[in-house]
């Protein structure tokens, strides 16, 4: 992979520039960015797995340590308050030494409740950035996640630095290794649970390390959009496999989906047609194109596909207008990707947070942005046999538009989704997923 150290220099300079810019605009003196703290399970002494504040992760790859803080004014070297308690119950992390540490003044915190000793004495013009507003109250922050600051950072997080792009390429490389292992396990007859174990082993990450709960769906389970159950027994008849699974690197996410048929049949041909359509949609990405228009184009392409495979009848434009395509493809084409899987600012029109909503008929679209260089998005068209949606379609008079015999033929296969992670450049698109050989 790329040498991160020189890339990080420019990344931290950009972070400092953004802070200085927004502080001047919002008339603030500095930001205190809290990594977060543990959440305890109800009536128990066990904590939920810790997930760091994404605004904290944007600065440095300290991902699993609560009670840390970044203090920054955009001018001076930022301070990292690093939590290192005296604790004989748990492993205590070493003081970090890495490519990024020289860019911070590191102060050690041994007791979380003593952090006030390391904060500025007057917090009137400092803003707290984080989840735990009760902590902010106790410490005396008057400015807590101010809209002007949050909207600014969310907008600018959409434009990835070279360091961030390098991290996302590496996250894709790791995830592709897992996808290859999972595909092999499927064809060898593994259960969903066994495929999941093969995937995690191949990427060297645990269930709490990956950026989201993997979707490992065999047969009809592939029709459940966010299927996260794992059946331990392999199915008696093996028809299809949908895997939506990612990986993390330095806090940045990969989010990749593939679908496979166990045998050569009409479903296999449908996968190939969907794959061709997905590649065409990636080719349509360029600066100045609104993502909403790509999503609408997907519905018109899907309508043609439904007609070609005899799944629907009529005119393609009517299938879109009547919402028939939305029954088979109810989710959005994709979303922003970065520190979060569904990254922020998908609906932002500017750095002030002006909201551009999804079209009324496409409420599950997660992005309405105009594409620009350094944006990273997923492109993930789908096709599913979802009985609850088909029942609604039958009930409201659109049943004649559907070939129910073909629907019944495809039902055991569940559905298809194909998803790549794409960087928008000025003159080209960079499909990180395909570039790594995952076809």
UniProtKB/Swiss-Prot annotation:
Transmembrane residue ranges: none
Binding of Mn(2+) 1, residues: 255, 335, 380, 419
Gene3D superfamilies assigned to the protein according to its UniProt record, in alphabetical order: Creatinase/methionine aminopeptidase superfamily, Creatinase/prolidase N-terminal domain
Cofactor binding notes: Binds 2 manganese ions per subunit.
GO biological process: proteolysis
Record-level Gene Ontology MF annotations: aminopeptidase activity; metal ion binding; metalloexopeptidase activity; phosphoric triester hydrolase activity; proline dipeptidase activity
Positions annotated to bind Mn(2+) 2: 244, 255, 419
Coiled-coil stretches noted in the UniProt entry, renumbered to this chain: none
Stored InterPro entries: Creatin/AminoP/Spt16_N (IPR029149), Creatinase/aminopeptidase-like (IPR036005), PepQ_N (IPR048819), Pept_M24 (IPR000994), Peptidase_M24B_aminopep-P_CS (IPR001131), X-Pro_dipept-like (IPR052433), X_Pro_dipept (IPR022846)
Named cofactor requirement(s): Mn(2+)
Role, per record: Splits dipeptides with a prolyl residue in the C-terminal position.
HAMAP family for the chain: X_Pro_dipeptid (MF_01279)
UniProt family annotation: Belongs to the peptidase M24B family. Bacterial-type prolidase subfamily.
Protein name per the record: Xaa-Pro dipeptidase
Organism: Shewanella amazonensis (strain ATCC BAA-1098 / SB2B)
